[in-house]
Amino acid sequence: MKRTMITMATIAASALALAACGSAESVGGNASTEGSENGQTTLVVGSQDYYSNEIIAEAYAQALEGAGFTVDRQMRIGQREVYMPELEAGSIDVFPEYTGNLLQYLDQNATARSSDEVYDALRSTLPKGLRALEQAGATDQDSYVVTADFAAAHSLTSIGDLANAGTLTLGGNSELRTRPYGPTGLSNLYGVTVNFTPIEDSGGPLTVKALKDGDIQLANIYSSDPALADGTLTVLTDPKGLFLASHVVPLASSRVNDD
C-alpha cells in the first residue's frame, strides 16, 4: 500500500498555535500514514472529556484536514481508563496527552521528575503500537487549589502547609482517589490527610463551585483553567514534586510512521 507523506511538524505547530499551547515541532518530523493518497487517508483524532484537551485535538484535526486528510473526530471520550484501551487497539491515531500524568498512569512507581526525564521515561513505557511524538514547551499541570480566603485564614502557600489546616475534603474526578498524586500521595509525601469527594467535571465549574461554597476545602484543578485568574483561588506550590511535569504531547498510533 502506498505511503502518503505529510509534514507533521507543520501540522503540530499549527495545532498548538490554534490551541494557545505554545510552539512544538511535533506530531513528529517527516511522517507517513498508511493509505493511498491525501484525501483518501482517514485519521481518527480523539480527545479527553475536558475542554482544553478537546481544543488541542480539534486543532490537530483541522491542521490534518488542511493537509488533505479526512479526519474522524472522536471527542470527549472520557478519562484514561476509557480511551487508553482504544489507543492501544489502534482505534485512534492521534491524541493529545500530558507527559507526567500519562507516565504515572502507566507506571505509578515512576521516579522521573524533570521534563526531559519524564518524556524519556514515557517513551520507553508506552504500550506497543503507541509513540509519544515531540513534546511541546507548554504544560497543563494538575494543581491543588484552595480559596484565597481559606489560604489567608490558614497561612497556606504550599501543599505541605495543609497538614496544619484541620479537616480537609479533596474534590476531583473519581479516578483521583487512586492516582499517585491523590490522597495517598498527599499523605505519603506531605503528611496531609484528606477525605475525598468525587466531582466528575475534571476540575471545572462544578468543582470550583463546591470549593467556593465550602463543600470541599481542596480541589484538583488544571493550571490552564481560567477560573484561576480572578484572584479568588490560590494554587498551592508543590516543592516536593507530587505532580510530575506534564507537557502537551501527541500520541500517535502505528499507522503514523516517522519515515
Model feature map: region roles:
Residues 38-52, 60, 69-74, 166-172:
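Short, well-ordered beta-strand elements
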Residues 115-170, 254-257:
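A conserved helix-loop-strand patch within extracytoplasmic ligand-binding domains
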Residues 15-20:
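C-terminal motif of bacterial Sec signal peptides marking the signal peptidase cleavage site
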Residues 22-25:
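Bacterial signal peptide processing site
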Residues 106-133, 215-218, 227-240:
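Ligand-binding "clamshell"
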Residues 129-131, 136-140, 224-259:
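Periplasmic-binding protein-like
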